[in-house]
Curated annotation (Swiss-Prot):
It comes from the Eukaryota. It catalyses: [protein]-C-terminal L-amino acid-glycyl-phosphatidylethanolamide + H2O = [protein]-C-terminal L-amino acid-glycine + a 1,2-diacyl-sn-glycero-3-phosphoethanolamine. The keyword Metal-binding does not apply. The gene is ATG4A. It is found in: Cytoplasm. Cysteine protease that plays a key role in autophagy by mediating both proteolytic activation and delipidation of ATG8 family proteins. The protease activity is required for proteolytic activation of ATG8 family proteins: cleaves the C-terminal amino acid of ATG8 proteins to reveal a C-terminal glycine. Exposure of the glycine at the C-terminus is essential for ATG8 proteins conjugation to phosphatidylethanolamine (PE) and insertion to membranes, which is necessary for autophagy. Preferred substrate is GABARAPL2 followed by MAP1LC3A and GABARAP. This is Cysteine protease ATG4A. The active site is at C77 (nucleophile), D279, H281. GO terms for biological process: aggrephagy; autophagosome assembly; autophagy; lipid metabolic process; mitophagy; piecemeal microautophagy of the nucleus; protein delipidation; protein processing. Belongs to the peptidase C54 family. GO terms for molecular function: cysteine-type endopeptidase activity; cysteine-type peptidase activity; protein-phosphatidylethanolamide deconjugating activity. GO terms for cellular component: cytoplasm. InterPro entries: ATG4_LIR (IPR046793), Papain-like_cys_pep_sf (IPR038765), Peptidase_C54 (IPR005078), Peptidase_C54_cat (IPR046792). It comes from Pongo abelii (Sumatran orangutan). Inhibited by N-ethylmaleimide. Redox-regulated during autophagy since reducing conditions activate ATG4A whereas an oxidizing environment such as the presence of H(2)O(2) inhibits its activity.
Length: 398
C-alpha cells in the first residue's frame, strides 16, 4: 500500500511541475486587492505571489487520530486551500497586506508563529490533523474530500480555540451576509462593561456605525468573513463572472476556495478572464520545528509562476474570503459590495442590515466548555457533539 501511495504522490508532483509563463500584455493583474501592470511589474507580481504561504499535500507526518493516514495526498487539497486562505488572513492581521517575503531572509517572529499554526502536528491549531478531526463533526470521515463550505465551518470552529490570533470567523448562510450579526460578533466591550446597558444599540445602521459610535466599543475583533456560494448548477453562470472578479479587487480580499470536482485550488487573483491560483497538488515531506525553534520555510512558498484557469471552467461551488482588521475595514467592504456586487440584476450574494426574522436567533459562536486545549479537545471525536452540525450545502458536479 505504501508503495502505491508513493507512486501516486510522485505522479501528482510531476503533473504540477509545469507552470505556464505569463503573457506579455498591457493588462492589469489583480492579486488579493492589489494591482500589478504585467508588462512592467512582472518581477514585483511574482514576488507578491511568492510571499503567500503555500500549503500542499504532505507525507510522513504522525498518523491522524493515532491510527489514521500519515499523508493527505488525494484527499486533503481543500483543507490545504483553507489553510492558505486563513494564513493570508493572519499575515494581514499581524504583518499587513504589504509585507513581503524573501528567500533565506530572517523573518519577523510573528511570521514564524503564524507558520507554526499550520504544521502537520495534532498540537498545532490549524494542522491537517485538527481540520480532519473537526471535519468529523461536519459529517466528513477522516480521509474524505471536503467542499468549500465544510472547510469554512471547520475553520470557524477551530478559531474558537485560537487565543493568540483572536479572530471572529463569520460564515454566511443562504447567500446572505448580515451586518447586524457581524457587528454583534466582532465588537469587544470595554473592560468592565459587562452589562447589557453597555452594549451598543442594535438599531445602528451600517452608515452610522463607521462614525460617531466609538464610545460604545473600545475594540473590534479582527474578522475573517467567508461567503460560500453556488454560482450555477453544473457550471458557473457567466452572469456572475464580473462580480466574482470584482471581489479580488477589494482591499479586504483573501481570494476564493474552489476548483474542480475533487480538485481544490486557492484562487488569489485574475488576469483578464483567467483566474490565478496556488495549487496544493504537490506532495512534500513533513516539516517540523527545528532545534532552534524555527521552521525551515523554503517549501512553504511557491517560487514558480502560479497556474491559471479560465473562469468559466471553475466549478460553481466556491467560497469567497475577506479580512477586516478594523471596523472601518468592514464598513468599507459593505460600501464596496453595495456599489459593485448588489448593482447586478442577478446578485452573487445579498448584504442585509438586520437579521432575517424567519431565521433562528443569531448566537455568536463560543468555545465549548471543556477543560482541555483545542488540540486535545478534538483529539477525541466524541467531544465534537458540543458543536452543532452545519449543513454542507454544496453539490459538486460529477
Amino acid at each position: 500500500m505504501e508503495s502505491v501511495l508513493s507512486k501516486y504522490e510522485n505522479q501528482i508532483t510531476i503533473f504540477t511541475d509545469y507552470l505556464e509563463e505569463y503573457p506579455d500584455t498591457d493588462e492589469l493583474v489583480w492579486i488579493l486587492g492589489k494591482q500589478h501592470l504585467l508588462k512592467t511589474e512582472k518581477s514585483k507580481l511574482l514576488s507578491d505571489i511568492s510571499a503567500r504561504l503555500w500549503f500542499t499535500y504532505r507525507r510522513k507526518f504522525s498518523p491522524i487520530g493515532g491510527t489514521g493516514p500519515s499523508s493527505d495526498a488525494g484527499w486533503g487539497c481543500m483543507l490545504r486551500c483553507g489553510q492558505m486562505m486563513l494564513a493570508q488572513a493572519l499575515i494581514c492581521r499581524h504583518l499587513g497586506r504589504d509585507w513581503s517575503w524573501e528567500k533565506q531572509k530572517e523573518q519577523p517572529k510573528e511570521y514564524q508563529r503564524i507558520l507554526q499554526c499550520f504544521l502537520d502536528r495534532k498540537d498545532c491549531c490549524y494542522s491537517i490533523h485538527q481540520m480532519a478531526q473537526m471535519g468529523v463533526g461536519e459529517g466528513k470521515s477522516i480521509g474524505e474530500w471536503f467542499g468549500p463550505n465544510t472547510v469554512a465551518q471547520v475553520l470557524k470552529k477551530l478559531a474558537l480555540f485560537d487565543e493568540w490570533n483572536s479572530l471572529a470567523v463569520y460564515v454566511s448562510m443562504d447567500n446572505t451576509v448580515v451586518i447586524e450579526d457581524i457587528k454583534k460578533m466582532c465588537r469587544v466591550l470595554p473592560l468592565g462593561a459587562d452589562t447589557a446597558g453597555d452594549r451598543p444599540p442594535d438599531s445602528l445602521t451600517a452608515s452610522n456605525l463607521s462614525k460617531g459610535t466609538s464610545a460604545y466599543c473600545s475594540a473590534w475583533k479582527p474578522l475573517l468573513l467567508i461567503v460560500p456560494l453556488r454560482l450555477g448548477i453544473n457550471q458557473i453562470n457567466p452572469v456572475y463572472v464580473d462580480a466574482f472578479k470584482e471581489c479580488f479587487k477589494m482591499p479586504q480580499s483573501l481570494g476564493a476556495l474552489g476548483g474542480k470536482p475533487n480538485n481544490a485550488y486557492y484562487f488569489i487573483g485574475f488576469l483578464g478572464d483567467e483566474l490565478i491560483f496556488l495549487d496544493p497538488h504537490t506532495t512534500q515531506t513533513f516539516v517540523d520545528t527545528g532545534e532552534n525553534g524555527t521552521v525551515n520555510d523554503q517549501t512553504f512558498h511557491c517560487l514558480q509562476s502560479p497556474q491559471r484557469m479560465n473562469i468559466l471552467n471553475l466549478d460553481p461551488s466556491v467560497a469567497l474570503g475577506f479580512f477586516c482588521k478594523e471596523e472601518k475595514d468592514f464598513d468599507n467592504w459593505c460600501s464596496l459590495v453595495q456599489k459593485e456586487i448588489l448593482k447586478e440584476n442577478l446578485r452573487m450574494f445579498e448584504l442585509v442590515q438586520k437579521h432575517p426574522s424567519h431565521w433562528p436567533p443569531f448566537v455568536p459562536p463560543a468555545k465549548p466548555e471543556v477543560t482541555t486545549t483545542g488540540a486535545e479537545f478534538i483529539d477525541s471525536t466524541e467531544q465534537l457533539e458540543e458543536f452543532d452540525l452545519e449543513e454542507d450545502f454544496e453539490i459538486l458536479s460529477v
